[in-house]
């Protein structure tokens, strides 16, 4: 399974998040997406999904909520961001 913590496109265009999803869809793995933001009626137009961010923080063993997105796990193992996924796809799965 590929799990991706990401910024939703309807809130902010995140090229790396979009590309990570595209790469994941090119595999035969099941994909699970975790949005770290949600649309809100506040002045910003969004709010953070703190429960999702705190889950990510715990999974990677970080004491901070600040991350570069996307953050990706393959079969429960944290591999990092888009560049790590691209490297994994090329080296392990043999395509890119």
State the predicted function of each range.
Residues 1-37:
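Local sequence-structure signature of Cys/Sec-based thiol-disulfide redox active-site neighborhoods
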Residues 17-24, 51-58, 92:
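Short, aromatic/basic amphipathic alpha-helical patches
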Residues 36-68:
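Thioredoxin-like thiol-disulfide oxidoreductase module
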